[in-house]
Each structure stands twice: as C-alpha cells, then as structure tokens.
C-alpha cells in the first residue's frame, strides 16, 4: 500500500527515448537513473531472433556503462507477452538461429551472461507469456515483477530444445530439483500466483499497475549504496556461477581495495619510485 509520506516512489516517470537505430527493441532512460529495454516484436509474442539479441546486448552495454543509470528493466512490448523465447521460424539446422546473412547464432547465451555479471540490478517486468527462452531470461534477472496475467513455463522439449545452463541449474536453485524437473519434463504452464508460490517472481500486481510498481522497486534500490548492491549481487551469484562468479566477487573486492589509502599507498610508492610504507596500516584480527 502506498505510503503518503513517500510520494516520490510513486511519482510519474518520464522516459527519454533512445530507440533510434534499433529495429527489434525500444530503449528508454529516465532522469532518475532507470533504463528500460523493451523487446518490440509483439507480432510473434516478443520472440527473439539474432538481431533482437544483438540490439539488447548493445542497449544493455550502454546502460551498464552509463554512470547515471543504477537499475535496468527488461520487458516486452504490450500486455500479451514478455518474451516467448527464440523465434522458431529462424531456427536453422546448424546449431542456432539464422540472421539475415544466414549465419547461425546462440547469442542469447551472451546476453544471459551480461545480465548475470552486470553490477547493476536488473529487473524483469513481466506481462503475459514468459515462455521458453523468455522464461530463462526473466529468471536470470535479479528481480521479477509480474502482472496478474503473466504465464510462465518451459517449452524446450516440445520443440526439440533445452537450456542446460542457468535455465536448468538456476531454476533448480529457485524452485527445487523436483519442481524444476516437472517444469522442464512436462512443459506445463503456470499462472502468476503459482509462480509467486514457487519463488519464481517477487510480487504480482494488476497489469495496469505493473510499470508503476516496477518503477517503485527500482527507485527503492536507487536509494541504496551502489557498491553494496554490486557486491551483494556478485556474492549471491558466486555459488552458482563457479569460477566466473568468484572472479566477479573478487573483482569487486579489488575495486574496493583500490579505493583505500592502503591500496593507494602501493600505487603511489611505485609511481614515486620509493619503498611503500605499509606500517601505518592496522593488521586487524
């Protein structure tokens, strides 16, 4: 319920359009630090093709490296679908989805890694179908805000496909091994309430309130320490992501150390051609 003392969280959001040059996505930013990437292929339930993923990767990189952006929202155009996975009409015979030149891609795996390793929180804003590869995309996002018309599930085994990476292992971490096997082996579909009960989504709201609620969650996170958020994201990912997860966590620790006087003493001593003096720093237990 809205707190009347905190109207800023519910203030209307003003999006600036940065979609020029894109054909398959829409890209917007707000002045208060939120970026929104929208899959814009409603005629195919926002299924992605190689061009779609290429554009998402480009926009995502822009949002990641924009120091004014603190949270990234991923969504689909319209109320009928978040994303229905890979566009089977362009799926080829040589291990991927064909682009216009005939080259086969599975570049959605690169986009999954981008979401996972981005130091900024990524929020899936889901209305309608989040199916197949679209279901995996929303799971990999840090948070999922779902409309009451959202439908979740995997279709891979029905169309000769599967995701044996995060789509399987991370799902099992969220819903448990038995439920994950049910979702994959039976290819059933689940409504928003069922998804909430399984822990697949964070909250469910009426469709008319979906963007408003998503923005509220984003603004709440923007009030918190960005370094704390990035370190927590890396820490929460590390147990699932193996050495890559540990690398991300360690990289954040290195970044923090570089900000300390102790870390800067070593750098300064090297540049000043003198021996470093670390004796002034406490050796805490």
Curated annotation (Swiss-Prot):
One of its GO terms (cellular component) is cytosol. The keyword Lyase applies. Its cofactor is hydrogencarbonate. Keywords: Lyase, Menaquinone biosynthesis. Disulfide bonds: none annotated. It catalyses: 2-succinylbenzoyl-CoA + H(+) = 1,4-dihydroxy-2-naphthoyl-CoA + H2O. Hydrogencarbonate binds at residues 154-156. Substrate binds at residues 45, 84-88, 97, 129-133, 155, 161, 258, 273. GO terms for biological process: menaquinone biosynthetic process. Pfam families: ECH_1 (PF00378). Pathway: Quinol/quinone metabolism; 1,4-dihydroxy-2-naphthoate biosynthesis; 1,4-dihydroxy-2-naphthoate from chorismate: step 6/7; Quinol/quinone metabolism; menaquinone biosynthesis. The record marks 97, 258 as: Important for catalysis. Its EC number is 4.1.3.36. Belongs to the enoyl-CoA hydratase/isomerase family. MenB subfamily. Converts o-succinylbenzoyl-CoA (OSB-CoA) to 1,4-dihydroxy-2-naphthoyl-CoA (DHNA-CoA). This is 1,4-dihydroxy-2-naphthoyl-CoA synthase. It comes from Pasteurella multocida (strain Pm70). The gene is menB.
